[in-house]
Swiss-Prot record:
The protein, known as: Protein strawberry notch homolog 1
Predominant cellular place of this UniProt entry's protein: nucleus
Cross-referenced SUPFAM superfamilies: P-loop containing nucleoside triphosphate hydrolases (SSF52540)
Protein family: Belongs to the SBNO family.
Name of the encoding gene: Sbno1
Pfam families in alphabetical order: AAA_34, Helicase_C_4, SBNO
GO molecular function (one): histone binding
Disordered, as annotated region: 21-47, 652-725
Phosphoserine carried by residues: 126, 178, 656-657, 661, 700-701, 1262
Keywords: Acetylation, Coiled coil, Inflammatory response, Nucleus, Phosphoprotein, Wnt signaling pathway
Length: 1269
């Protein structure tokens, strides 16, 4: 019988990477190591230690062997830890009984002399003597050491082959110990675990979508899919009857699935939340499904029920035309759309605003915070809208693309933005309004949901009191948790999310090789930036700049750094894009090129400098660095300095006031900042700019007199003349160096593309910029405005779009900023029906963003699906981004060209790296580079030179490692484990260095993920059972009522048994059909416990020699094996030879785990714990239904029984009778406490029933409607 406390220790130990079993019995191997004669210090290794954070120690259970606790002396390290050291008794007598362990604060039974010596030496901190000291003889080889850092509480694993002194001085961190490389050794008993690594597969992630409960309307013109987890829950019954005209439905102006969304939204709007607000609805449809029409349908439905006023918020004013088109298309011609920004301040219904009494007011999020300077009663847009709606307003408010209304409610120290507060205030002031949120990434990013307070997920009457409670619960639980929230919302009828299937779409990855000259130029640029960084630092120190100024300066510096290298990356691809585009046009297709940013600001600056004259295309990259040096280099002008020194204090200094520079930053950041931000490079840039601007605004809002960046400690205003001179000189030198480099820097990508592809008359440009640089017939270069005689700038993009859709121009270039919501597909209604080829030069590194981008050319009602071309260079990580995006496209149904990605699918593409494993891997990488930690993997073998040394220099150059001035000690940047920052910054390293570093990061990530899998801590998102050949049966189901504010209200606990083995009969059936020369039965070369492994092998990819493997106990394996690996471990045999071994393992795996089968005993079983590794038949307990309503209860049980770290694993099942179940796996030891909790909360069940009855009294139409339906 296991004592209650032992669970805790086992959890803690396995968390630390120590196999709990090692504490209990002695493996033959281990015992052999504990020889009585002490070998020399060099060979002997320290005892295995697990360091617990202090507060865990009082919960330590009683253990059979001696436990020694040594308190760490505060002098040596700042971590409060206690080290638990494992000693294995090598005496002949048996173990002491488990009930009475010896726990003592002493050193183990080593010779007394040693003990004294060690104590004294520790007291005197005598390091040399300590190093000579031999460890006690009876200490076994370590398993691993783990140390919990107080700073972040996460347990990190360190390899245990550090010098012996480490343990004797209690894990003191010493710089001088060079980390020795640890080559992972495969122990023989690891092997059978491997086959169990992913016993649950990920099946296809999307399923074909059809409305289930609603049978009206025509089919959607294109195939639509939904994630499988959502498709396995059914929405509530429909009792609402829409008022939309038969004509609209019969003509298919609203398709069946758009009508479904309209109906559920209207039905949800009939219910109220516990706090009295009307419930809202979230449309999570992806790009191209027709969100616009669905919204128009909801507005129309309410208009017909005489709710004639509606508000529609979106990201750009251009989309107003789309809104009008959508309303017109569904037959709601009489509903007018008014732009909020065209109204004068004052009553909207007044005469001077055209007496607007009804219709839709269309506004952008930014216009919501508009304010008039002149005063008056309705001087803000918000007041205008509130007055127009009236207090009892029960019409529709639509928040379209609501994820774009950034930082509506940032969590943490930053304040919510004005826009965010306005959106919340609008909802709070109009509690009866019918709110609709629309966002394709609606429920994938929980933080984006902050302002969706009408969904009733948090607040009064829900498990989460505040939004922050909800966020904490969800983010702690990883990917799976968000899926549960989404499923729960669909169950309750408040969420719907479909995506256009990518069937028919093809994509290819074009690798652009970098020429020698380009790499040379790139490396030169890197060197210049490294020098610039040093000069900025030196100059700031010279003139003794203030902290605030430095912060602003570095914000600008890194923002420019990132943009500079982004531009260089993109420029390397221009030639290839031009070639490809010309080819595609020849083949009768048309081309769409996606860019993230336009570089307009640089062009304007160059123009200003040249007095309106240009003699060549402007180099955006050069402009970035030049403007940085000119505006933000800390070298004050002489004249300005004098004015600062008191001659005229009122003139603020251009170069020295961060307020100015922040304003400037805003100005130039207008285009470049925002576009680099949109590109998915969640960089340190945009955030810093924002925060620097805020902070500098706050600090300089006082009197200008008391703000001076050059004040020294004595508050005197004197800056040494000499220092200023030197700073000026540095600035001049930098600009000279830049001029030298500028000869090689590439020109503005957008202008070059347009020029190469035949000029503005052939290329439709849809971007946010106002002018462009063109080359004239005589070869001269000039700047011209984009606007044309008959077309105002506002609708220029729409005109250009029309020209493209009419076939006047066959090439379109779109920038991120201008493109949201624009449709460029080969529409059946458009003249230009050529197949679209969509090329992207810059992939965002989140797949969601990429899909959003591709939604421009892949939409409903198209004649042909587009082709995507990703252009990637060999710079750090671009291939990786491409494969992540490709992976997502494949799961949505797209096809690759040819078979070239078959190799990559075995590659790393399945790991998205912006997650906790990525951050963990990055932490290990960074720490190993500065010798704070030992590397998990060896550096890339083909790197010429000293990898760690070179990379260290490189990272110092890009500011991710800082050097302390006086001591020369290396420290890591505060955000050193921020993936986005890392990926952006390493672009500023020389080409071969960044590639090697990225490779090293990727290898480390693979190792981290493998470790997590081994320790059973890997969060795989949603897993599938019954997707392969397993047989899934329901053996029991318990139902529980749960309180809920609407019709939902129960959870079920299923007991599921899964049989996954393969009998000999089944195996021989497959074997009979095999044809390949290497197919057939194999036996393992290694014999363990007098047994061999039998497997059945089938070749699935002859070109790559990839084989599928079947095992007797676990059936078909997900992981394909390469032939070379197979040959190392197995030899081919005839079926008769395999028979005995196959049957033996098949029969024993019914109730014997792999360990017991191969070793004769299982450590876990000997403790009385259940071990299921390698079993043929497994039992799972799955909780489904409205899990969100009992979330806190489930959390409570899981935490109390299994410790806080148990992960929430979601599973998808398909039972033998075809039923689909999605839910949470409840660990076996949590089942009975959970059942008790759910069933004893009888009151809440009664309450739930009462709430339901009460609800039905309040909504009689639901009952009458039900009888009508």
């Amino acid at each position: 019988m296991v004592e209650p406390g032992q669970d805790l220790l086992l959890a803690a130990l396995s968390e630390s990477g120590i196999s709990p079993n090692d504490l209990f019995d002695v493996d033959g191997g281990d015992a052999g190591l504990a020889t009585p004669t002490p070998p020399s210090v060099q060979q002997q290794q320290p005892p295995s230690t697990t360091t617990f954070v202090l507060n865990q120690i009082n919960q330590l259970p009683t253990l059979g062997s001696t436990i020694v606790m040594t308190k760490t002396p505060p002098a040596t390290t700042n971590r409060q830890t206690i080290t638990l050291t494992k000693f294995i008794q090598t005496t002949a007598n048996t173990r002491p009984s488990v009930s009475a362990p010896a726990v003592r604060n002493a050193i183990p039974p080593a010779p007394a002399k040693d003990q004294v010596q060690l104590k004294d030496l520790l007291k005197n901190n005598s390091l040399n003597e300590l190093m000579k000291l031999k460890p006690p003889a009876n200490i076994a080889q370590p398993v691993a050491t783990a140390a919990a850092d107080v700073s972040n509480g996460a347990v990190k694993k360190e390899s245990s082959n550090k010098e012996v002194a480490r343990v004797w001085i209690n894990d003191m961190k010493m710089r001088s110990f060079s980390p020795t490389m640890k080559v992972p050794v495969v122990r023989e008993e690891d092997e059978p675990e491997e086959e169990d690594e992913e016993e649950m597969g990920h099946a296809e992630t999307y399923a074909e979508y059809m409305p289930i409960k609603l049978k009206i309307g025509l089919r959607h013109p294109d195939a639509v899919v939904e994630t499988s987890s959502l498709s396995s829950v059914t929405p509530p019954d429909v009792w609402y009857k829409t008022s939309i005209s038969e004509e609209t439905i019969d003509n298919g102006w609203l398709s069946a699935l758009q009508l479904e969304a309209v109906t559920y939204a209207a039905q949800q709007h009939e219910t109220f939340l516990p706090n009295g607000d009307r419930a809202g609805f979230l449309i999570g449809d992806g790009a191209g499904v027709g969100k616009g029409r669905t919204i128009a349908g909801i507005i129309y439905e309410n208009y017909l029920l005489s709710r004639k006023r509606a508000l529609w918020f979106s990201v750009s004013n251009d989309l107003k035309y789309d809104a009008e088109r959508d309303l017109r298309d569904i037959g709601a011609k009489n509903i007018l759309v008014h732009s909020l920004n065209k109204f004068k301040y004052g009553k909207i219904s007044s005469k001077h605003n055209g007496s607007v009494k009804k219709g839709v007011i269309f506004a952008t999020y930014s216009s919501l915070i508009g304010e008039s300077q002149s005063g008056g009663k309705y001087k803000t847009r918000l007041k205008q809208l509130l007055h127009w709606c009236g207090d009892d307003f029960d019409g529709v408010i639509v928040f379209d693309e609501c994820h774009k209304a950034k930082n509506l409610c940032p969590v943490g120290s930053s304040k919510p933005t004005k826009t965010g507060l306005a959106v919340l205030e609008l909802q709070n002031k109009l509690p009866k309004a019918r709110v609709v949120y629309a966002s394709a990434t609606g429920a994938s990013e929980p933080r984006n949901m902050a302002y969706m307070n009408r969904l009733g997920i948090w607040g009064e009457g829900t498990p989460f009191r505040e939004f922050s409670d909800f966020i904490q619960a969800v983010e702690r639980r990883g990917v799976g948790a968000m899926e549960i929230v989404a499923m729960d919302m669909k169950l309750r009828g408040m969420y719907i999310a479909r995506q256009l299937s990518f069937t028919g779409v093809t994509f290819k990855i074009e690798e652009v090789l970098l020429s020698q000259s380009y790499v040379k130029m790139y490396n030169k640029a890197v060197k210049l930036w490294v020098i610039a960084r040093e000069r900025f630092q030196q100059a700031a120190d010279l003139i003794d700049a203030e902290q605030r100024m430095k912060k602003s300066m570095w914000g600008q510096f890194w923002s420019a750094h990132q943009r500079f290298f982004k531009y260089l990356c993109i420029a390397s691809k221009v030639k290839r894009v031009v070639q490809l585009a010309r080819e595609e046009i020849k083949n009768g297709k048309c081309v769409v090129i996606g860019l993230q940013s336009t570089g307009e600001a640089r062009t304007l600056e160059a123009l200003e400098e040249g007095g309106g004259e240009l003699n060549d295309f402007v180099s955006t990259a050069k402009g970035v660095l030049q403007s940085l040096i000119e505006k933000h280099f800390p070298a004050p002008d002489r004249k300005k300095l004098y004015s600062l020194l008191g001659i005229d204090l009122t003139a603020p200094s251009n170069n020295s006031s961060p307020r100015d520079s922040a304003k400037k930053a805003r100005k130039i950041g207008g285009l470049t900042g925002s576009s680099s931000d949109d590109s998915g490079s969640e960089s340190d840039v945009s955030d810093n700019e924002e925060s620097d601007y805020e902070s500098s605004k706050n600090m300089s809002s006082g009197d200008d007199d008391d703000f001076n960046p050059f004040r020294d400690d004595n508050s005197s205003l004197i800056t040494s003349q000499d220092a200023v001179e030197r700073a000026q000189q540095m600035k001049k030198d930098l600009l000279d160096k830049l001029e030298k480099l500028a000869e090689d820097l590439p020109p503005n990508t957008l202008d070059e593309l347009i020029d190469e592809l035949g000029g503005p008359e052939n290329v439709a440009e849809m971007t946010g910029r106002k002018g462009r640089v063109v080359s004239n017939d005589d070869g001269s270069i000039s700047y011209e405005s984009r606007s044309e005689l008959d077309v105002p700038v506002e609708i220029l993009n729409i005109t250009e779009k029309q020209r493209f859709m009419d076939g006047d121009k066959n090439i379109a270039i779109i920038s991120e900023a201008a493109s949201s919501g624009i449709s460029l597909q080969a529409d059946r209604r458009a003249k230009n029906q050529r197949r679209r080829v969509h090329m992207t030069l810059e992939l965002p590194w989140s797949a969601d963003r990429a899909i959003q981008q591709f939604g421009r050319t892949h939409r409903s009602n198209q004649v042909t699906a587009p082709e995507y071309v990703f252009l990637i260079s060999e710079l750090a990580g671009e291939q990786r981004f491409a494969s992540i995006v490709a992976k997502r496209l494949e799961s949505l149904g797209a096809l690759t060209h040819g078979d070239r990605r078959a190799t990559e699918s075995r590659d790393l593409s399945r790991f998205n790296f912006d997650n906790k494993y990525g951050r963990n891997a990055l932490e290990i990488v960074m720490k190993s580079i500065v010798n704070l930690d030992s590397p998990m993997v060896s550096p890339p073998p083909d790197y010429p030179g000293e990898f760690f040394k070179d990379v260290r220099q490189g990272l110092i150059g890009v500011g991710l490692i800082n050097v302390e001035d006086r001591s020369g000690i290396l420290t890591l940047d505060k955000d050193y484990n921020n993936i986005g920052k890392f990926l952006n910054r390493i672009l500023g390293m020389e080409v071969h260095q960044q590639n090697a570093l990225f490779q090293y990061f990727a290898d480390t990530l693979t190792a981290v993920v493998q470790n997590a899998k081994k320790n059973g801590r890997y969060d795989m998102g949603i897993l599938d059972l019954g997707s392969g050949d397993e047989k899934v049966r329901k053996s029991d189901v318990k139902k529980f009522l749960t309180p809920g504010y609407s019709t939902s209200g129960h959870v079920e606990l299923y007991t599921i048994s899964v049989e996954r083995g393969m009998s000999w009969d089944e195996a021989t059936k497959i074997w009979a059909e095999l044809t390949g020369p290497d197919d057939g039965f194999y036996l393992s070369l290694q014999i363990r416990n007098n047994k061999k492994t039998a497997i059945l092998v089938k070749e699935v990819n002859p070109k790559k020699k990839l084989f599928l493997i079947y095992r007797p106990n676990t059936g078909k394996q997900l992981k394909l094996e390469i032939y070379a690996d197979l040959k190392k471990k197995y030899k081919k045999v005839v079926s008769d030879d395999a028979l005995v071994h196959w049957l033996d393992q098949y029969n024993s795996s019914a109730d014997t785990c792999t360990h017991a089968y191969w070793r004769g005993n299982c450590k876990k079983a000997s403790l009385g714990l259940v071990c299921e590794i390698g079993l043929r038949c497994r039992t799972y307990y799955v909780l489904c239904g409205s899990v969100l309503s009992v979330w806190t209860k489930v959390e409570g049980v899981l935490a109390s029984v299994s410790g806080t770290n148990v992960k929430m694993q979601i599973v998808r099942l398909r039972t033998e009778d075809g039923q689909r179940i999605v839910g949470l796996i409840i660990p076996a030891n949590c089942v009975s406490p959970l059942v008790n909790l759910l069933s004893t909360s009888d009151q809440s069940q009664q309450l739930a029933v009462q709430q339901k009855q009460l609800w039905q009294q309040h909504h009689p139409q639901s009952i009458t409607n039900l009888s009508n339906v």
